[in-house]
Regions:
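A short hydrophobic beta-strand element
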Residues: 78-88
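Residue-level signal for well-ordered, solvent-exposed loop/turn and beta-edge residues enriched
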Residues: 34, 95, 111-113
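Short, cysteine-centered beta-strand-loop-beta hairpins and adjacent loop/turn segments enriched
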Residues: 90-97
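Short, surface-exposed coil-to-beta transition loops
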Residues: 68-70, 97-103
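Short beta-strand segments enriched in hydrophobic/aromatic residues
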Residues: 29, 88-90, 119
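Short, low-complexity N-terminal intrinsically disordered segments enriched in polar/charged residues
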Residues: 1-31, 129-130
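Short beta-strand edge/turn micro-motifs at domain boundaries
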Residues: 104-126
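A solvent-exposed, acidic/Ser-Thr-rich amphipathic alpha-helical stretch
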Residues: 30-80
Length: 130
């Protein structure tokens, strides 16, 4: 079975995030994307619109002094949905974390319209992000 084209688009998006390539992310994210960041920390909330999501990314890097990193392991996708499995690492104030993460996406015409990030260790995530 051939790989769905959205798998490659999602993989490219994670690679672009790692490089800070916002041109690729601009193409991947719908203008009206909604990004859901769960937990009970300073980054928790719903970010509406591409610019708000990019602001969230900037804050994420600021809070972790640029140590936030995603190691992508698997991507599944079809026309309407995407799932990415990854390991996230970050450090802040002398504390470090490594956590498994599952990201779920709604897609329309190859663009991410909604995104949920879910950590297997939400308490550690909250501790790192304060």
């Amino acid at each position: 079975m051939a790989e769905h084209p959205n798998v490659a688009r999602i993989r490219d998006g994670y690679a672009a995030f790692a490089k800070g390539d916002f041109d690729v992310l601009t193409d991947l994210f719908a203008d009206n994307i909604v990004w859901h960041s769960g937990g009970r920390n300073q980054l928790t909330g719903d970010y509406r619109g591409r610019e708000a999501v990019f602001g969230y990314f900037a804050r994420l890097m600021e809070v972790t002094d640029g140590t936030f990193h995603i190691d992508l392991h698997a991507v599944l996708a079809d026309d309407e949905h995407g799932v990415a499995l990854a390991i996230v690492t970050a450090s802040r104030n002398g504390k470090s974390m490594t956590a498994n993460e599952a990201d779920v996406m709604h897609l329309r015409d190859g663009r991410v319209t909604e995104f949920w990030t879910t950590s297997a260790d939400p308490y550690t995530v909250d501790e790192i992000f304060g």
